[in-house]
A protein has these predicted regions:
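Conserved catalytic alpha/beta core of Sir2/sirtuin-type deacylases, generalized to analogous enzyme cores
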Residues: 1-135
């Protein structure tokens, strides 16, 4: 069984250079206390979380991975407002490919009525339960 997790908005555990010196993103699962704030190992400038902030474009490679992942058996939409495209269109794309769709979100979204199952709860509650049943 293949699993694919696409982080359209990045990851807090990945850092990148604030100035974009060309250093590739690096992963750091610990909070570096020295120096604080963390620095780019290539140029010494400030590092920033490897996430997409408001007004920034989603990484095209991740968008392409997400669209390709819609050709699946099970599609989980977790913690999204389903308001902003291209992410808002992924549930419909997965359904087009015949996927069973599940939304996990405390609040109803525009996708709620379209998914096969809507679980109205926080991801940090639902995902461990799903994991324990699959594990």
């Amino acid at each position: 069984m293949a699993h694919l997790l696409v982080r359209l908005h990045g990851s807090l555990w990945e850092l990148s250079c604030w100035q974009g010196c060309g250093a590739s993103a690096w992963r750091d699962e610990r909070v570096p206390l020295d120096p604080l704030p963390p620095r780019c190992p290539a140029c010494g400038d400030l590092a920033r979380p490897g996430v997409v902030w408001f007004g920034e474009a989603l990484p095209q490679a991740e968008v392409e991975k997400a669209v390709e992942a819609c050709a699946c058996d099970l599609f989980l939409s977790v913690g999204t407002s389903s308001l902003v495209y291209p992410a808002a269109g992924l549930v419909r794309e997965a359904q087009f490919h015949g996927a069973y769709t599940v939304e996990i979100n405390p609040e109803a979204t525009p996708a709620t009525a379209a998914v096969d199952i809507a679980l109205a709860a926080p991801a940090d509650v639902v995902l461990p339960l799903i994991d324990s049943r699959l594990g």
